[in-house]
Amino acid sequence: MEMKKGIFQAIGSGVLLALAFSSFNLGFLAWFGFVPVFLALKDTSLKKAFFLFLITGVVFWAGTIYWLVHVTLVGTIVLVVYLASYFAFFGLVIRPCTRQSKLWALIFIPSVWVLLEYLRTVFPILGFSWALLGYSQYLYLPVIQVADITGTWGVSFLLMFANVAIVEIIYALRTKQARRLAQASVLLFLFLVLVLSYGFYKINPRPTSHVLRPTRISVIQGNIPQEFKWDPARNDFIMGSYINLTAAAADDKPDLVIWPEAAFPVVLEEEPDYLRRVKDMAASIQAPILIGAITTKDGLYFNSAVLVKAQGVLSKYDKIHRVPFGEYIPLKNVLPFLETIVPIGDIAKGNEYSVFTIYPAGNNKPVKFSALICFEDVFAGLSRNFARNGADFLVNITNDAWYKYTSAPFQHLQASVLRAVENRLNLARSANTGISCFINPVGKIVSVIEDDSGREIFVRGYKTQEISVTKAEPSFYCRFSDWFVLICALITLILLVRPLVALRHPAAPYAPPRR
């Protein structure tokens, strides 16, 4: 009976956490989403802890990345199981360690979680930085401001800390331990006060002595159906759609116009007439146009962001972080049979963190920016390197049309918001079917393309926004990278040594100390 109850609790946690990443803006659920499965750990063995957290992981990931079935059913199942294994390993590690003092649990468990999130992100080939726990708070601006110091990892730590503290409070109430209750409550309160005080301080505007350079940017959302992409019969329709939207945006006198990923319907170098139309439009509106296009060089093909002006191509960036099994086949030289299972063309890897330069009207000072293509904005290291290279603002061009009317575009937006906060830079998004918007350095979505009903995906349009480029010092996180993860790794290593002896004892987690 207890095991059956534990399974229901594990499923409940998976559902709560998945809803926190849904399109329904339920991020608050992440503050206590782990509580049911944590409570189910009472009197469980290592094997059962592994099993319970595996269930939570499967439910969470199935409910979070269900939209991948529009691309691959088998791949979705494999990925769900792989990602759920991180949950299972998490349960395995923390189960014996919960026998330690409650104060250690409050520090240890969040540290383990952050370390596993980081490993999931950087793991070779299978690195997947989607749905980090901290992303769920993208609408709660005071909570996420700490990301400019710790990265998103600090937000994830805070959420896990809150979950563990709530469990401590529940056990203290059940066992009538006033001291335990006070300790957990006070620590949670102090942690929240510290983070929220910093958050409110950062989001309140303050006078600055830095030189501001207003730059007007227009983002285009073509809303081209995925089945139209790369259909030669649709090329003129696609190009005409973007040309017409750009012409409409010209009334706002933008300094830069941004098209989505792969908006250019042909390989750039193979169809000069299409490139000429873009150059003519750039000349007409007197502003450069950043287009997403497939480019080729020396027999290789790249997924690129290309800056075009009346004179021609000014510069380009080739995507660095490609999508495995979507843009290339990992290990195909070692396992050649994969090419027959996944028959896709290879997109070559870029190797340069390119920075584009534009000159806003009425301003002889250059403004620099960098582009993140597709899911590159979910990897903090890429944005950080662009910021270090001198980018004054960031751009994300993407095509999420693959995933239909699902939560995928909203989850993708979550990552963009945290990238803006981490680097304290404006971020402009141009997405084929949405969500196209502008995000300011504190993570606020200041404007978005939407229809009259407020729908943001699968609508056609453009949006122009003036951003103020501020020449300020790089954020602490930008300068010192993932230092917070290193601290969590050290805490994990140190505290793992202590409970090894506890493996011989079946003591309950969070058990009251013996008097």
Model-derived regions, located:
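Membrane-embedded alpha-helical bundles of multi-pass enzymes
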Residues: 2-205, 405, 419, 431-433, ...
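Soluble catalytic regions of membrane-associated enzymes that act on cell-envelope
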Residues: 199-328, 345, 355-365, 371-377, ...
